[in-house]
A protein has these predicted regions:
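Short glycine-enriched loops at secondary-structure junctions
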Residues: 1-5, 108-111
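Functionally critical mobile loop/hinge segments
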Residues: 21-23, 27, 32-168
Length: 168
């Protein structure tokens, strides 16, 4: 579900510099996983997603603070909570993806055709990669290249005046 939602609203959702997709999209993935484990009915799952729409959060303004990684934990917690509540009869907007919800967290109209294509297409898990370093994926190429440069041209930290890296 996360891959499908991402297909509909990325890269604008992230690139507009406001949203932290781990928190805003991750909550739906957590609810889907929890719902599958809990054996939610389709109706309960739709209610869980409706609850998630009200709980999704994560802003790029928190990057560099303790609140940034907390968005991932909150997405997991909120997705699990939404699934548990829905399994106990709690309702949310069951037709949330038929509304303009996704348009509101994107700078353009969400591409629902892409969402459906990814939802019913190959599973996104086959595209997953392990992160080699404990930091944002866009910085990995810089780390790899710095390691290559240092291997070819050893320097001490005192010899390096400045490193400039612009991942975007």
């Amino acid at each position: 579900i996360m891959v499908a939602i991402s297909a509909a609203i990325m890269p604008e959702h992230y690139n507009q510099g406001r949203w932290h997709a781990t928190g805003t999209i991750g909550v739906f993935g957590a609810a889907a996983a929890a719902g599958a484990i809990l054996g939610l009915t389709p109706e309960e799952m739709c209610n869980a997603f409706g609850v998630c729409a009200g709980l999704c959060s994560g802003i790029q303004l928190n990057f560099g603070t303790m609140a940034k990684p907390m968005a991932a934990g909150m997405a997991a917690k909120n997705g699990l909570m939404a699934a548990i509540l829905a399994g106990r009869g709690f309702t949310g907007r069951a037709d949330i993806f038929d509304t303009d919800f996704l348009d509101n967290i994107c700078t353009r109209k969400a591409d629902i055709e892409k969402l459906l294509e990814r939802l019913y297409g190959p599973y996104g898990i086959h595209e997953l990669r392990f992160k080699r370093y404990p930091c944002g994926a866009p910085t990995h190429s810089g780390i790899i290249n710095c390691k290559k440069i240092l291997a070819e041209h050893p320097h001490t930290i005192e010899e390096i005046e400045k490193i400039v890296f612009e991942p975007y």
